[in-house]
From Swiss-Prot:
Similarity comment: Belongs to the complex I subunit 6 family.
MF GO annotations: NADH dehydrogenase (ubiquinone) activity
Protein name per its UniProtKB record: NADH-ubiquinone oxidoreductase chain 6
Classification via Pfam families: Oxidored_q3
Highest taxon listed in the record's lineage: Eukaryota
Enzyme Commission number(s) of this protein: 7.1.1.2
Subcellular localization(s) per the UniProt record: Mitochondrion membrane
TM ranges: 1-21, 25-45, 53-73, 82-102, 141-161
Membrane topology: Multi-pass membrane protein
InterPro entries tied to this protein: ComplexI_Subunit6, NADH_UbQ/plastoQ_OxRdtase_su6
PANTHER family, per database record: NADH UBIQUINONE OXIDOREDUCTASE SUBUNIT ND6 (PTHR11435), NADH-UBIQUINONE OXIDOREDUCTASE CHAIN 6 (PTHR11435:SF1)
Role description: Core subunit of the mitochondrial membrane respiratory chain NADH dehydrogenase (Complex I) that is believed to belong to the minimal assembly required for catalysis. Complex I functions in the transfer of electrons from NADH to the respiratory chain. The immediate electron acceptor for the enzyme is believed to be ubiquinone.
């Protein structure tokens, strides 16, 4: 299980680097899907199945809409790929930064970092994930509604930006 979680952590870092290096909106959307899937898999591995499902739906439902309309707005005839020199420079700087930060904090990263939610306490009556669900709908209900409203507002802003003169979102770029 530790090896599986380590591979998922490496996949999360690679997915986030694909989004941050941003060669083209097409590849950044692919990196976002990889990062969201692997990050939610990490949460499932640590015992947060409901939270990972909610985050996965928010990422794919909200952010991929933004990336789809960004790709429609910024359609390039020859998009940059991950093999271009500028993108490789960004990726190498990110890898060096991760290496030096990892080397600096290596001693503090040991210990309980691989322990799931249920392995910390033996006499709990409910799982840790279900306690989080209760807090999400009780105390965090306002933030849940606010987050949904912000995603809806973002969708309308992107639709308005890509609308064009009078052709709607199906205009020729």
């Amino acid at each position: 299980m530790v090896y599986f979680m380590f591979i998922m952590l490496v996949g999360l870092i690679l997915g986030l680097m694909a989004v941050a290096s941003n060669p083209s909106p097409y590849f950044a959307a692919l990196g976002l899907v990889v990062a969201a899937g692997v990050g939610c898999g990490l949460l499932v591995g640590h015992g947060g199945s409901f939270l990972s499902l909610v985050l996965f739906l928010i990422y794919l439902g909200g952010m991929l809409v933004v990336f789809a309309y960004t790709a429609a707005l910024a359609a390039e005839p020859y998009p940059e790929t991950w093999g271009d020199w500028s993108v490789l420079l960004y990726v190498s700087v990110y890898l060096l930064g991760i290496f030096f930060v990892g080397k600096y904090f290596f001693k503090e990263w040991g210990g309980l970092g691989w322990v799931g939610v249920e392995e910390m306490s033996n006499l709990e009556m409910i799982r840790g994930d279900f306690g989080g669900v209760a807090l999400l709908y009780a105390n965090g209900g306002i933030m849940l509604v606010l987050g949904g409203w912000v995603l809806l507002l973002t969708l309308f802003v992107i639709l308005e930006l890509t609308r064009g003169l009078s052709y709607g979102t199906l205009r020729v770029v």
